């Protein structure tokens, strides 16, 4: 065959490839898409015996189409594996990286474990060292899988490699993304000093070395979210306020109508085509951390208001595209609102919303959300059982929570509630054992100031029940010192009302009144019906002692009102179909039918995401409350 004939044949084949690809794309983008004909066009390419690169790319495209538009996962896998086997040995050919990334996603969808996905990505990371974009993208994807498997040290190491690679390529924006992602992983590991060092380093780069103002604002939001979460994890509600305010201002800037689209901001340079979360999801996340802050500070009305707004925003985003991260946000918000409801005495609403959280978890593919939130759900059901005086059920729920979770704060929280159950059921041996264990585990390790304040509160409650009033005062003053330092209003009100009861028990009515008055003022602001019930009983006794008949009557009337509200709510609880959840101790939670969660909560209405975990723990907002020291 002559050279001219060969050239002519090649040109003819190229024309066929281009025509078939164009036709395939036409069918894919038709309204509605004609995927069958699109696949037929791509399949026809193979009849021309195309060159290796064309063949590999076509197999990749077939895999992409099958994954996106059909349920034929096995055929998608075959095409992707073929694309990988052809492209892997070919130098300077990006198809291998795209294929590896997709194959890893497919393995995660279909395999029982992540071993194959990790192996595929590790090989692709090795091969991509001369391609900074793909090297960084694959490192992020692999670190995400390790983080999801709670292999945090490996995830952290990969993110450190990514930061170095970005630095060597002078990709400053990308380097900061890696630094902040690593800070998030270290936060989960409770390596507080390392977190601070990384945040400080990233903060200086954001301030001084990011010339693009829009990218700078995005990084600032990521940085501030981590800073706020860092302070909240330490229970530092007062310290966090300036950072939270700055975060709220930054998100308003990003959500303004004149703000450019993500595609405009991140589409110009390949090494800047990475965002942590799209701005619409960041908006929900800022609501979420605001809810967490309001809960810890003891502002239940605010927490409810922001939860409702966030859930409304989530429903709007779900209507556009139901991203898995939205379900994560929804579950965490529901976990917070459940605690709100119980503090305010709305336990029937609380069990409805626990059921709603269960439904979201059960709807996620492969029960992935249920695995991550099962311990939290057991903990919430334990609190609900405790508040409805089902102590045996509550104990079993907390024991399951402790056995399932690896989060130390959640474990501490559940153990403190177990201690209160043992206190109320007069199981002194079990109580001593759990308090000793909590003390040993948390003396020399990092813990939330709110939770450690709660630990002192439980010890004060224990001393009060033993009639060791001097010891009770010592513990409760320690609790008050910690609570007042960081404006932990619920911890303050609980400590004050218990301290008032201590003084009442030793006949010091003046000091008792000095404690119960601010306790009731705080409780009405929160509002916390349990502290109000307890405080009104103390006030009734104090006014009787001082022979103040009218004030005694008023206090008694208030006590009856709070008590009747709780009794009426208790009646609704036991009649609710969702009440059956108290009997869930293992496996999948039972399906219960009943009224949905409060209607107001369920109102209707490219860049690469470096989607490392967003929220490390959903238990940070839990604080002590209740007449007998229940924790919410």
Curated annotation (Swiss-Prot):
Chain positions of TPR repeats: 453-486, 493-526
A biological process from GO: chromosome segregation
Lineage: Eukaryota, Metazoa, Ecdysozoa, Arthropoda, Hexapoda
Similarity comment: Belongs to the SCC4/mau-2 family.
Cellular compartment(s): Nucleus, Nucleoplasm
Protein name per UniProt: MAU2 chromatid cohesion factor homolog
Stored Pfam families: Cohesin_load
Keyword entries, A-Z: Cell cycle, Cell division, Chromosome partition, Mitosis, Nucleus, Repeat, TPR repeat
Record PANTHER family: MAU2 CHROMATID COHESION FACTOR HOMOLOG
Main location: nucleus
Function: Required for association of the cohesin complex with chromatin during interphase. Plays a role in sister chromatid cohesion and normal progression through prometaphase.
The UniProt record lists the keyword Metal-binding: no
Subunit details: Interacts with Nipped-B to form the cohesin loading complex.
Record organism: Drosophila simulans
GO cellular component assignments: chromatin; nucleoplasm; nucleus; SMC loading complex
């Amino acid at each position: 065959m002559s050279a001219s004939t060969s050239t002519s044949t090649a040109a003819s084949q190229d024309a066929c490839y281009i025509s078939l690809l164009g036709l395939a794309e036409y069918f894919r983008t038709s309204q509605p898409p004609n995927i069958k004909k699109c696949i037929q066009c791509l399949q026809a390419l193979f009849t021309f015996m195309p060159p290796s690169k064309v063949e590999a790319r076509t197999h990749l495209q077939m895999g992409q189409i099958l994954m996106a538009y059909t349920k034929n996962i096995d055929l998608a896998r075959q095409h992707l594996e073929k694309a990988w086997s052809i492209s892997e040995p070919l130098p300077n050919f990006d198809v291998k990286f795209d294929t590896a990334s997709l194959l890893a996603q497919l393995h995660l969808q279909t395999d029982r474990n992540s071993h194959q996905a990790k192996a595929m990505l590790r090989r692709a990371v090795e091969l991509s060292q001369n391609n900074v974009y793909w090297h960084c993208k694959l490192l992020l994807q692999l670190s995400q899988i390790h983080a999801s498997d709670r292999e945090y040290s490996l995830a952290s190491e990969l993110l450190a490699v990514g930061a170095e690679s970005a630095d060597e390529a002078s990709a400053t924006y990308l380097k900061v993304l890696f630094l902040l992602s690593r800070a998030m992983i270290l936060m989960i590991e409770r390596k507080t000093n390392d977190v601070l060092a990384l945040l400080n380093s990233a903060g200086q780069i954001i301030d001084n070395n990011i010339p693009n103002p829009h990218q700078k604002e995005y990084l600032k939001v990521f940085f501030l979210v981590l800073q706020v979460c860092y302070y909240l994890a330490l229970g530092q509600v007062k310290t966090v306020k300036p950072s939270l305010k700055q975060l709220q201002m930054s998100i308003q800037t990003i959500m303004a109508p004149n703000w450019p689209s993500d595609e405009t901001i991140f589409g110009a340079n390949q090494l800047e085509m990475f965002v942590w979360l799209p701005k619409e999801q960041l908006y929900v996340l800022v609501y979420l951390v605001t809810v967490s802050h309001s809960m810890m500070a003891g502002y239940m009305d605010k927490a409810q208001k922001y939860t409702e707004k966030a859930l409304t925003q989530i429903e709007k985003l779900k209507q556009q595209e139901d991203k898995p991260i939205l379900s994560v946000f929804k579950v965490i918000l529901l976990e917070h609102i459940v605690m709100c409801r119980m503090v305010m005495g709305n336990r029937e609403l609380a069990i409805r919303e626990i059921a709603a959280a269960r439904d979201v978890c059960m709807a996620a593919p492969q029960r992935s959300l249920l695995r991550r939130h099962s311990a939290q759900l057991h903990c919430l059901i334990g609190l609900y059982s405790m508040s409805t005086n089902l102590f045996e059920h509550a104990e079993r729920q907390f024991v399951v929570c402790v056995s399932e979770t690896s989060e130390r704060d959640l474990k501490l929280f559940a153990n403190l509630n177990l201690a209160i159950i043992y206190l109320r059921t007069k199981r002194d041996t079990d109580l001593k054992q759990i308090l000793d264990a909590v003390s040993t585990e948390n003396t020399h390790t990092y813990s939330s100031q709110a939770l450690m304040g709660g630990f002192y509160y439980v010890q004060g409650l224990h001393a009060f029940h033993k009639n060791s009033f001097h010891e009770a005062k010592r513990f409760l003053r320690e609790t008050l010192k910690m609570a007042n330092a960081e404006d932990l209003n619920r911890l303050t009100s609980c400590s004050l009302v218990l301290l008032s009861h201590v003084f009442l028990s030793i006949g010091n009515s003046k000091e008792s009144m000095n404690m119960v008055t601010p306790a009731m003022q705080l409780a009405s602001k929160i509002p916390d019906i349990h502290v109000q019930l307890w405080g009104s009983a103390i006030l009734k006794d104090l006014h009787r002692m001082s022979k103040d008949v009218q004030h005694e009557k008023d206090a008694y009337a208030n006590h009856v009102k709070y008590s009747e509200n709780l009794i009426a709510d208790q009646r609704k609880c036991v009649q609710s179909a969702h009440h059956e959840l108290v009997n869930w101790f293992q496996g999948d939670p039972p399906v219960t039918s009943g009224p949905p969660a409060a209607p107001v909560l369920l109102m209707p209405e490219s860049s690469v995401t470096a989607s490392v975990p967003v929220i490390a723990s959903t238990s940070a907002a839990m604080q002590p409350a209740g007449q007998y020291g229940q924790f919410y």
